[in-house]
Amino acid sequence: DSSTSRGLGDVYKRQDTVKALIAPLRARHSIECTFGAAMPIERRLALKAQYPDAEHPVVRTHPETGEKVLFVNGFTTHFTNFHTPANVRVGQDFTQGASGLLQYLTGQAAIPEYQVRWRWRAGSVAIWDNRATQHYAAMDYPPSHRKMERAGIVGTPTF
């Protein structure tokens, strides 16, 4: 099976306090914290050189629908601009809530009400918009092998 969560626009629309907090945020994304986590350091460094960290807005606008979509996932390591005078305790470089907020946002994709679950069969075709969804491949096929072909369509990037 595969699951996709649609950009979590519904969460963004409903949670006014969260919406105000995350609107200006940017986040760091790294392949190292997922695929590279269990690799020897040499392979991890080579992977990171091939796929360097990137920084993106946490809330992006879909170029065709105008919908606000969240861009946080398992590759998101931290917010890069959460430290402000309003949310850092005096005299300490400690940001309360940043870790919990990131866990909350990434955890929303695991809620079944925000997902479409696709059961693959021979000849199945599924299409989703990577600019507004997150994909998860359930590990429900062993001892069989998972074989699929994936194609990407070049389009307008989300801004």
Which residues fall in each region the model found?
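Histidine-centered active-site/metal-ligand motif
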Residues: D1, H62, H135
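Single conserved hydrophobic/aromatic residue that forms the stacking wall/gate
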Residues: D1-Y12
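Compact, glycine/acidic-enriched structural inserts
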Residues: D10-R28
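A residue-level signal for conserved active-site and pocket-lining positions in enzyme catalytic cores
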Residues: I22, G66, G123
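Intrinsically disordered or highly flexible coil/loop and linker segments, enriched in small
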Residues: R28-F35, Y114
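A mid-sequence, solvent-exposed acidic-amphipathic segment
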Residues: G36-V88
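Catalytic core of Fe(II)/2-oxoglutarate
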Residues: D53, L105-F159
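Short, basic/aromatic beta-hairpin or loop at an interaction surface
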Residues: T95-T106
